[in-house]
Amino acid sequence: MERTAFYFKDISEKNRLTKQRGVTLLEIIIVLGIIGVIAAGVVVLAQRAFTAQDISDIQNNTNSIRTSMAETFQDEGEYPPATATTVTLTKGNIATTDDLAPIVTLNKLGKISPSESFNGISGDAFQIGQALVDSGSGVHKGFVILISGLDQQTCRNLLSQMGNQWDYVGIISAPAGEDESAELNGTELDADKKAGSVLKSLSVAEDITSTDIVSEETCNIGGANNGIVFGSK
C-alpha cells in the first residue's frame, strides 16, 4: 500500500515538474517574441533617424553649395557645366583632382569641405550643372544641383522640406552612381510646370503644394532611382 502511494506520489511529482518545464519554455518563447518585436521597432526607428539626419545634412549642404556657387561664379558671365566624371569623385580626392566639376572648384577655393560635397543617401558627390534662366537665351545664368538615389518616400520628404526654397524643382531618373551631366546641363529654369516632372519653375509663380507632392506621378520611379533637380538663378 505504501509502495502504491509512493508510486502515485512519484508520478504526481514528475507531472508537476513537467508542467513547470512547459510553462518555463512558454515564458521563454513569449519573452523572445517580445524582444523580437522590440528589436524590429528599434531597427525601424534607427533607420528613420538615419534618414532624417541624411535629409537634414542634404538641406544644409545644398544651402552652402548654393551660396558658394553664387559667390564664385555669378560675376563670370555664366555658370560652369557638370562633368561626366563627377560620380567618380571621392572625399579623398575631391579637393585635389584636376576634374573641372563645379563641386571640385568649390572645394579647391575652400568654399565648402569634402564632407559637405556628398549626398549622404546615395554616397555620390553632388552633380552641379549649368541652367538657362531664359530658355530663349543661350547664356547659362543659373545652375542646378542633383540629389540622386532616392526612394519615393525620401524623395517626397525632401520635396516637402526643400522644394519651395528653390527657383526650380524637377524630377528625373537618377540612380546612385549614375552620370546625369547631359540631362542637367541646359536645364530650362523657366520650363512649363508638368506633373511629376517639373513641379516648380520661374514661369509659374506658385509654390509646390502637398497635393503636388503626393500625386501618383511624383517620385514614382521604382526603387531608389528618383532624383530631384533643384535650380537657382
Regions found by a protein language model. Name each.
Residues 1-21:
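N-terminal leader/signal peptides at the extreme start of proteins
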Residues 21-33:
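N-terminal signal-anchor/signal peptide hydrophobic helix marking the start
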Residues 28, 48-55, 144-148:
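Short, charged/polar micro-motifs that form catalytic or ligand-binding hotspots
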Residues 32-53, 71-73:
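C-terminal juxtamembrane segment of a hydrophobic transmembrane alpha-helix
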Residues 49, 61-80:
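N-terminal alpha-helical signal peptides/signal-anchor transmembrane segments
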Residues 58:
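Glycine-rich anion/phosphate-binding loop at the beta-strand->alpha-helix junction
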Residues 72-109:
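Short, glycine/small-hydrophobic-rich surface segments
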Residues 110-233:
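Intrinsically disordered, low-complexity regions enriched in Pro/Ser/Thr/Gly and acidic residues
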